[in-house]
């Protein structure tokens, strides 16, 4: 049975569609949702042209992280609030497939949900997609939600039968 679902979002339209889809599914299953936004690392040194090393000051890192957490809670989590679900949100830095798989394992999730394509299309070209990377990082089922998809009663029954 699916009790906990991890949904990854980057704030794009596709990511928000995955959150809305997850909210519909979780409402029908009575599952809790852990929304995860994975941000690129801000803190390590950056080597610039000519070998110059630049650092992002810690206060800038802290403020940026706090602002992002607030945006995640106020904007990205709205479908979860509207559905009346038990949910939590997390903002973590790192590689999206690794972070999502680690969070899913840590919270005991039975399912991971992501959108089809987010804001990092150029990064996907260089490093591979989040959804593909997830399939290499976890043994959990990964649902890739196409833009505009909706949960139907039929898909919910299928999800319950697999549990």
Where do the language-model regions lie?
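Conserved beta-strand positions in the Rossmann-like core of class I SAM-dependent methyltransferases
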Residues: 34, 88, 143
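Structural beta-alpha unit
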Residues: 1, 14, 28, 75-112, ...
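Short, well-ordered secondary-structure micro-motifs
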Residues: 18, 45-48, 101-102, 124-126, ...
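Small/aliphatic-rich secondary-structure junction motif
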Residues: 2-55, 83-85, 162-163
